[in-house]
Amino acid sequence: MAKQSMIARDVKRAKLADKFYAKREELKKIISDANSSDEHRWAAVLKLQTLPRDSSPSRQRNRCRQTGRPHGVLRKFGLSRIKVREAAMRGEIPGLKKASW
């Protein structure tokens, strides 16, 4: 089980990313727009830098929903490989079975 503080930190980052999503996208659009003036683009870059670091979606970590484990997480299930295996062995995931060939 991951430390509760690490899980809480990721939850906080997700909330910040949602809060600043629109503003961040607007600034990125200005920066990537070739028609805008250099001063306008530079002002957008500086404004983007003033936003909180944790508001960037790339700072979030995929974590297992049950254990909070940060590595070996399968996106399709939102669980770590260990928990997916346990659930599959108990037959809790429909259509998923152990491979045999």
UniProtKB/Swiss-Prot annotation:
One of its GO terms (molecular function) is structural constituent of ribosome. The keyword Ribosomal protein applies. Gene3D superfamilies: 1.10.287.1480. GO terms for cellular component: cytoplasm; small ribosomal subunit. Binds 16S rRNA, required for the assembly of 30S particles and may also be responsible for determining the conformation of the 16S rRNA at the A site. HAMAP family: Ribosomal_uS14_1. Part of the 30S ribosomal subunit. Contacts proteins S3 and S10. This is Small ribosomal subunit protein uS14.
